[in-house]
């Protein structure tokens, strides 16, 4: 039993390392393309944005296939979070709102009608509820898993780091008053788009790692 557990753990770590290696390799590979090719690949609705959305859908499929229904229902907020990430990638938070449901201007602007404001508040409350449930119910397991170097929690930690990095890079010049060269802007965009694609990859590893752990 112990040997089997060690084998599965090592195999899962290999998956995690391979995924991280893939992300860094894609970043390095994209720097070899010229500016026009990079622009086409990284454009809104382009290859990498589409792949990111498909990967979130793949995560939902993995949950349905690999997890028992009891876990799916009791941890419904995890599936909801993945759906929210997919909708965010498709810019649904901006497409149907004047300023964007995640922007403070949405709740104080005179341009926002009362019905839209009420819908925005409901959506925001739902998002905050999902995040609160995850923090309250998964916090202890997450911390213990990271301390014990469990593959599923390490994958989630990697996804959190990717979220922080990509959100920091997004609008970096505006946020921090940094002037980037055209080459610097393209490299930042590469990191942002590939990093965003890496988030559902890490989610998928976490989902599969949970299943592997319970098969031992």
Question: What is the predicted function of each stretch?
Answer:
Residues 2-21, 150-152:
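N-terminal membrane topogenic signal
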Residues 42-50, 105-121, 183-196:
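Short aromatic-rich membrane-water interface segments that cap or initiate transmembrane helices
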Residues 90-147:
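Membrane-proximal helix-loop-helix units in multi-pass membrane proteins
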Residues 6-10, 64-75, 139-151, 215:
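Membrane-interface helix-boundary motifs at transmembrane edges
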Residues 29-40, 136-139, 168-180:
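Juxtamembrane "helix-exit" motif on the non-cytosolic side of transmembrane helices
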Residues 163-179, 189-216:
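C-terminal transmembrane-bundle signature of multipass membrane proteins
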Residues 11-29, 77-79, 157-161:
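Alpha-helical transmembrane segments
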Residues 21-23, 52-66, 118-134, 194-210:
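Hydrophobic cores of alpha-helical transmembrane segments in multi-pass inner/ER membrane proteins
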């Amino acid at each position: 039993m112990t040997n089997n557990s060690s084998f599965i753990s090592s195999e899962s770590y290999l998956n995690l390392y391979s995924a991280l290696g893939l992300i860094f390799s894609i970043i390095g590979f994209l720097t070899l393309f010229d500016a026009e090719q990079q622009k086409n690949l990284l454009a809104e609705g382009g290859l990498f944005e589409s792949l990111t959305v498909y990967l979130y859908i793949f995560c939902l499929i993995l949950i349905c296939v690999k997890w028992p229904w009891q876990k799916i229902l009791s941890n419904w907020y995890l599936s909801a979070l993945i759906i929210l990430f997919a909708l965010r990638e498709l810019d649904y938070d901006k497409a149907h709102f004047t300023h964007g449901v995640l922007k403070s201007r949405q709740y104080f602007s005179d341009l926002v009608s009362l019905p839209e404001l009420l819908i925005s508040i409901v959506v925001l409350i739902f998002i905050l509820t999902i995040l609160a449930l995850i923090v309250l119910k998964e916090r202890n397991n997450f911390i213990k898993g990271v301390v014990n170097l469990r593959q599923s929690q390490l994958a989630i930690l990697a996804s959190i780091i990717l979220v922080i990095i990509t959100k920091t890079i997004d609008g970096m010049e505006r946020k921090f008053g940094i002037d980037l060269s055209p080459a610097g802007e393209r490299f930042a965009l590469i990191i942002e788009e590939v990093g965003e694609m890496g988030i559902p990859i890490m989610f998928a590893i976490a989902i599969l790692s949970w299943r592997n752990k319970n098969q031992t």
